[in-house]
Protein backbone atom coordinates (compact mmCIF):
# COMPACT_ATOMS: atom_id res chain seq x y z
CA UNK A 1 0.00 0.00 0.00
CA UNK A 2 1.16 3.54 -0.71
CA UNK A 3 2.04 5.67 2.32
CA UNK A 4 -0.39 8.46 3.13
CA UNK A 5 0.30 12.18 2.76
CA UNK A 6 1.19 13.93 6.01
CA UNK A 7 0.57 17.65 6.50
CA UNK A 8 2.88 19.84 8.57
CA UNK A 9 0.42 19.70 11.49
CA UNK A 10 0.67 15.90 11.58
CA UNK A 11 -2.67 15.11 9.93
CA UNK A 12 -2.32 12.23 7.46
CA UNK A 13 -4.63 11.58 4.49
CA UNK A 14 -4.85 8.85 1.86
CA UNK A 15 -2.47 9.13 -1.11
CA UNK A 16 -2.91 7.75 -4.63
CA UNK A 17 -1.00 7.61 -7.91
CA UNK A 18 -2.46 6.77 -11.30
CA UNK A 19 -1.66 3.06 -11.51
CA UNK A 20 -2.90 2.94 -15.12
CA UNK A 21 -0.05 5.16 -16.36
CA UNK A 22 2.79 3.27 -14.72
CA UNK A 23 5.46 2.17 -17.21
CA UNK A 24 7.75 0.37 -14.78
CA UNK A 25 5.79 -2.91 -14.68
CA UNK A 26 5.60 -4.21 -18.27
CA UNK A 27 7.74 -4.14 -21.41
CA UNK A 28 6.79 -5.43 -24.86
CA UNK A 29 9.17 -6.11 -27.74
CA UNK A 30 6.64 -5.32 -30.45
CA UNK A 31 8.07 -2.87 -33.00
CA UNK A 32 5.25 -0.38 -32.38
CA UNK A 33 6.62 0.18 -28.85
CA UNK A 34 10.19 0.86 -29.97
CA UNK A 35 9.79 4.68 -29.83
CA UNK A 36 9.00 4.27 -26.11
CA UNK A 37 12.00 1.99 -25.41
CA UNK A 38 9.45 -0.87 -25.38
CA UNK A 39 7.92 0.42 -22.14
CA UNK A 40 4.15 0.06 -22.10
CA UNK A 41 1.64 1.42 -19.64
CA UNK A 42 -0.44 -0.71 -17.34
CA UNK A 43 -3.59 0.63 -19.01
CA UNK A 44 -2.39 -0.44 -22.48
CA UNK A 45 -1.57 -3.97 -21.34
CA UNK A 46 -4.48 -4.71 -19.01
CA UNK A 47 -7.32 -2.53 -20.31
CA UNK A 48 -6.78 -1.53 -23.92
CA UNK A 49 -5.21 -4.70 -25.35
CA UNK A 50 -5.87 -7.19 -22.56
CA UNK A 51 -2.70 -8.97 -23.64
CA UNK A 52 -1.46 -10.16 -20.24
CA UNK A 53 -0.71 -13.00 -19.75
CA UNK A 54 -1.67 -14.63 -23.08
CA UNK A 55 -0.22 -12.00 -25.41
CA UNK A 56 -1.60 -10.49 -28.60
CA UNK A 57 -1.50 -11.62 -32.20
CA UNK A 58 -0.27 -9.57 -35.14
CA UNK A 59 0.43 -10.43 -38.76
CA UNK A 60 3.53 -9.41 -40.70
CA UNK A 61 2.57 -8.86 -44.34
CA UNK A 62 5.19 -9.72 -46.95
CA UNK A 63 5.57 -9.42 -50.71
CA UNK A 64 7.97 -11.77 -52.48
CA UNK A 65 8.60 -9.25 -55.27
CA UNK A 66 9.14 -6.17 -53.08
CA UNK A 67 11.42 -8.12 -50.73
CA UNK A 68 13.68 -8.93 -53.69
CA UNK A 69 13.77 -5.31 -54.86
CA UNK A 70 11.43 -5.91 -57.80
CA UNK A 71 8.47 -3.68 -58.59
CA UNK A 72 4.86 -4.67 -57.95
CA UNK A 73 3.03 -5.72 -61.11
CA UNK A 74 -0.03 -3.80 -59.83
CA UNK A 75 1.94 -0.61 -59.11
CA UNK A 76 1.86 -0.75 -55.29
CA UNK A 77 4.87 0.40 -53.26
CA UNK A 78 3.85 -1.06 -49.91
CA UNK A 79 2.10 -4.21 -48.77
CA UNK A 80 -1.49 -3.57 -47.70
CA UNK A 81 -5.02 -4.91 -47.64
CA UNK A 82 -5.36 -4.66 -51.42
CA UNK A 83 -2.62 -7.29 -51.72
CA UNK A 84 -4.80 -10.07 -50.26
CA UNK A 85 -5.21 -12.83 -52.83
CA UNK A 86 -2.06 -11.95 -54.77
CA UNK A 87 0.20 -14.96 -55.40
CA UNK A 88 3.24 -12.97 -54.22
CA UNK A 89 1.58 -12.05 -50.90
CA UNK A 90 2.18 -13.93 -47.65
CA UNK A 91 1.72 -13.19 -43.97
CA UNK A 92 3.42 -14.38 -40.81
CA UNK A 93 1.55 -14.81 -37.54
CA UNK A 94 3.44 -13.27 -34.60
CA UNK A 95 2.51 -13.53 -30.92
CA UNK A 96 3.87 -10.89 -28.54
CA UNK A 97 3.64 -11.37 -24.79
CA UNK A 98 4.35 -8.50 -22.38
CA UNK A 99 7.10 -9.21 -19.88
CA UNK A 100 7.03 -8.30 -16.20
CA UNK A 101 10.14 -6.35 -15.20
CA UNK A 102 9.60 -6.30 -11.43
CA UNK A 103 10.07 -8.99 -8.83
CA UNK A 104 7.18 -11.28 -7.87
CA UNK A 105 6.84 -9.49 -4.51
CA UNK A 106 6.65 -6.06 -6.16
CA UNK A 107 4.20 -7.36 -8.76
CA UNK A 108 1.86 -8.63 -6.05
CA UNK A 109 2.13 -5.26 -4.30
CA UNK A 110 1.32 -3.56 -7.62
CA UNK A 111 -1.80 -5.71 -8.06
CA UNK A 112 -3.03 -4.72 -4.58
CA UNK A 113 -2.37 -1.05 -5.30
CA UNK A 114 -4.14 -1.36 -8.66
CA UNK A 115 -7.27 -2.82 -7.04
CA UNK A 116 -7.30 -0.03 -4.45
CA UNK A 117 -6.85 2.61 -7.16
CA UNK A 118 -9.64 1.20 -9.32
CA UNK A 119 -12.00 1.06 -6.33
CA UNK A 120 -11.22 4.71 -5.57
CA UNK A 121 -11.61 5.74 -9.23
CA UNK A 122 -14.91 3.92 -9.77
CA UNK A 123 -16.34 5.56 -6.67
CA UNK A 124 -15.72 9.01 -8.19
CA UNK A 125 -16.23 8.37 -11.91
CA UNK A 126 -18.84 10.74 -13.32
CA UNK A 127 -19.24 12.59 -10.02
CA UNK A 128 -18.36 16.15 -9.10
CA UNK A 129 -15.25 16.48 -6.94
CA UNK A 130 -13.29 19.28 -5.36
CA UNK A 131 -9.77 19.63 -6.76
CA UNK A 132 -7.02 21.82 -5.38
CA UNK A 133 -3.53 22.03 -6.83
CA UNK A 134 -0.84 24.02 -8.63
CA UNK A 135 -0.85 24.29 -12.42
CA UNK A 136 2.04 22.33 -13.94
CA UNK A 137 1.48 23.43 -17.54
CA UNK A 138 -1.19 24.55 -19.99
CA UNK A 139 -1.43 22.90 -23.43
CA UNK A 140 -3.77 23.33 -26.40
CA UNK A 141 -6.20 20.40 -26.63
CA UNK A 142 -5.85 19.08 -30.18
CA UNK A 143 -7.05 16.01 -32.10
CA UNK A 144 -6.22 14.81 -35.61
CA UNK A 145 -8.31 12.73 -38.02
CA UNK A 146 -6.17 11.04 -40.73
CA UNK A 147 -9.31 10.29 -42.76
CA UNK A 148 -9.84 14.06 -43.18
CA UNK A 149 -6.43 14.72 -44.75
CA UNK A 150 -4.79 14.85 -41.34
CA UNK A 151 -6.84 17.85 -40.23
CA UNK A 152 -5.99 19.14 -36.75
CA UNK A 153 -8.95 20.21 -34.64
CA UNK A 154 -8.68 22.63 -31.70
CA UNK A 155 -10.86 21.85 -28.65
CA UNK A 156 -9.74 24.39 -26.07
CA UNK A 157 -7.02 23.77 -23.52
CA UNK A 158 -5.74 21.16 -21.09
CA UNK A 159 -4.70 22.59 -17.74
CA UNK A 160 -2.23 20.05 -16.39
CA UNK A 161 -1.72 19.38 -12.68
CA UNK A 162 1.00 17.10 -11.33
CA UNK A 163 0.20 17.13 -7.63
CA UNK A 164 -3.03 18.01 -5.89
CA UNK A 165 -5.99 16.91 -3.80
CA UNK A 166 -9.16 15.22 -5.03
CA UNK A 167 -11.56 15.91 -2.18
CA UNK A 168 -9.41 14.75 0.78
CA UNK A 169 -7.21 12.31 -1.17
CA UNK A 170 -3.71 13.35 -2.19
CA UNK A 171 -3.25 12.54 -5.92
CA UNK A 172 0.48 12.53 -6.58
CA UNK A 173 0.18 12.19 -10.34
CA UNK A 174 -0.92 13.98 -13.48
CA UNK A 175 -4.49 15.20 -13.78
CA UNK A 176 -5.97 17.11 -16.74
CA UNK A 177 -8.64 19.81 -16.63
CA UNK A 178 -10.37 20.51 -19.95
CA UNK A 179 -11.38 24.13 -20.39
CA UNK A 180 -12.74 26.12 -23.31
CA UNK A 181 -10.94 28.99 -24.97
CA UNK A 182 -13.34 31.40 -23.26
CA UNK A 183 -12.59 29.96 -19.80
CA UNK A 184 -8.84 30.19 -20.46
CA UNK A 185 -9.28 33.78 -21.64
CA UNK A 186 -11.08 34.63 -18.39
CA UNK A 187 -8.77 32.98 -15.85
CA UNK A 188 -5.48 33.02 -17.81
CA UNK A 189 -4.18 29.78 -16.33
CA UNK A 190 -0.39 29.51 -16.37
CA UNK A 191 2.27 27.34 -14.66
CA UNK A 192 2.56 28.10 -10.96
CA UNK A 193 -1.03 29.25 -10.43
CA UNK A 194 -2.66 27.81 -7.32
CA UNK A 195 -6.25 26.83 -8.17
CA UNK A 196 -9.23 25.42 -6.29
CA UNK A 197 -12.37 24.35 -8.18
CA UNK A 198 -15.14 21.78 -8.55
CA UNK A 199 -15.37 19.56 -11.64
CA UNK A 200 -16.66 16.22 -12.88
CA UNK A 201 -14.06 13.44 -12.70
CA UNK A 202 -13.59 10.89 -15.46
CA UNK A 203 -10.98 8.73 -17.13
CA UNK A 204 -9.87 8.64 -20.77
CA UNK A 205 -7.45 5.92 -21.92
CA UNK A 206 -5.81 5.89 -18.51
CA UNK A 207 -5.73 9.65 -18.01
CA UNK A 208 -7.64 11.23 -15.13
CA UNK A 209 -9.76 13.96 -16.74
CA UNK A 210 -11.70 16.79 -15.09
CA UNK A 211 -14.49 18.55 -17.01
CA UNK A 212 -17.23 21.12 -16.42
CA UNK A 213 -15.18 23.19 -13.98
CA UNK A 214 -17.13 25.60 -11.79
CA UNK A 215 -16.64 27.68 -8.63
CA UNK A 216 -13.07 28.34 -9.76
CA UNK A 217 -10.86 30.25 -7.31
CA UNK A 218 -7.36 31.46 -8.16
CA UNK A 219 -5.71 31.29 -4.75
CA UNK A 220 -2.31 32.34 -6.08
CA UNK A 221 -1.60 33.82 -9.51
CA UNK A 222 1.86 33.91 -11.08
CA UNK A 223 3.18 36.48 -13.52
CA UNK A 224 4.16 35.44 -17.02
CA UNK A 225 2.84 34.62 -20.49
CA UNK A 226 -0.33 32.61 -20.93
CA UNK A 227 -2.05 30.78 -23.76
CA UNK A 228 -5.04 32.28 -25.55
CA UNK A 229 -7.06 30.81 -28.40
CA UNK A 230 -5.53 32.85 -31.24
CA UNK A 231 -1.99 32.04 -30.15
CA UNK A 232 -2.88 28.36 -29.78
CA UNK A 233 -4.42 28.14 -33.26
CA UNK A 234 -1.28 29.62 -34.81
CA UNK A 235 0.91 27.13 -32.90
CA UNK A 236 -1.27 24.23 -34.03
CA UNK A 237 -0.90 25.26 -37.69
CA UNK A 238 2.88 25.76 -37.50
CA UNK A 239 3.80 22.88 -35.14
CA UNK A 240 5.30 19.51 -36.07
CA UNK A 241 4.87 15.88 -35.08
CA UNK A 242 7.77 13.90 -33.59
CA UNK A 243 8.48 10.27 -34.39
CA UNK A 244 9.48 9.49 -30.80
CA UNK A 245 8.39 10.62 -27.33
CA UNK A 246 11.53 11.78 -25.46
CA UNK A 247 11.01 12.45 -21.76
CA UNK A 248 12.36 15.97 -22.24
CA UNK A 249 9.68 16.77 -24.83
CA UNK A 250 6.86 15.17 -22.84
CA UNK A 251 7.66 17.43 -19.88
CA UNK A 252 8.29 20.52 -22.00
CA UNK A 253 5.64 23.23 -22.13
CA UNK A 254 6.08 23.25 -25.93
CA UNK A 255 5.20 19.57 -26.33
CA UNK A 256 1.70 18.13 -26.23
CA UNK A 257 0.15 14.74 -26.95
CA UNK A 258 -2.37 14.80 -29.79
CA UNK A 259 -5.20 12.25 -30.00
CA UNK A 260 -5.05 10.54 -33.42
CA UNK A 261 -8.41 9.02 -34.38
CA UNK A 262 -7.91 6.36 -37.06
CA UNK A 263 -11.16 5.24 -38.66
CA UNK A 264 -10.98 1.72 -40.05
CA UNK A 265 -14.40 0.77 -41.36
CA UNK A 266 -16.84 1.13 -38.48
CA UNK A 267 -14.13 1.06 -35.80
CA UNK A 268 -12.27 4.07 -34.45
CA UNK A 269 -8.88 3.48 -32.86
CA UNK A 270 -7.23 6.21 -30.83
CA UNK A 271 -3.56 6.64 -30.10
CA UNK A 272 -1.44 9.64 -29.18
CA UNK A 273 1.46 11.30 -30.98
CA UNK A 274 3.82 13.91 -29.60
CA UNK A 275 3.38 17.34 -31.18
CA UNK A 276 5.87 20.21 -30.83
CA UNK A 277 4.15 23.59 -30.71
CA UNK A 278 7.41 25.26 -31.77
CA UNK A 279 7.67 23.16 -34.93
CA UNK A 280 11.01 21.57 -33.94
CA UNK A 281 11.19 18.10 -35.48
CA UNK A 282 14.58 17.10 -34.06
CA UNK A 283 14.73 17.17 -30.22
CA UNK A 284 18.54 17.26 -30.42
CA UNK A 285 18.37 20.72 -32.02
CA UNK A 286 15.82 22.12 -29.56
CA UNK A 287 17.09 25.29 -27.81
CA UNK A 288 14.73 24.95 -24.83
CA UNK A 289 16.29 23.65 -21.62
CA UNK A 290 14.71 22.87 -18.24
CA UNK A 291 15.47 25.27 -15.40
CA UNK A 292 14.11 25.69 -11.91
CA UNK A 293 11.47 28.15 -13.14
CA UNK A 294 10.47 26.32 -16.31
CA UNK A 295 11.91 26.10 -19.81
CA UNK A 296 14.29 28.74 -21.17
CA UNK A 297 15.24 29.37 -24.79
CA UNK A 298 19.03 29.24 -24.98
CA UNK A 299 19.27 30.94 -28.39
CA UNK A 300 21.77 33.80 -28.18
CA UNK A 301 23.90 32.16 -25.46
CA UNK A 302 27.33 30.69 -26.05
CA UNK A 303 28.27 27.06 -25.63
CA UNK A 304 31.78 25.69 -25.55
CA UNK A 305 32.74 22.08 -26.06
CA UNK A 306 35.92 20.43 -24.84
CA UNK A 307 38.43 19.67 -27.57
CA UNK A 308 40.05 21.37 -30.49
CA UNK A 309 36.99 23.04 -31.97
CA UNK A 310 34.81 25.72 -30.40
CA UNK A 311 31.08 25.74 -31.11
CA UNK A 312 29.09 28.92 -30.53
CA UNK A 313 25.33 29.31 -30.74
CA UNK A 314 24.06 32.73 -31.73
CA UNK A 315 20.41 33.42 -32.56
CA UNK A 316 19.83 29.75 -33.20
CA UNK A 317 22.75 29.37 -35.69
CA UNK A 318 25.78 27.19 -34.95
CA UNK A 319 29.23 28.53 -35.83
CA UNK A 320 32.32 26.33 -35.66
CA UNK A 321 35.84 27.70 -35.33
CA UNK A 322 38.92 25.46 -35.52
Model-derived features: positions:
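Beta-strand elements of well-folded, non-transmembrane domains
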Residues: 137-139, 163-167, 181, 201-203
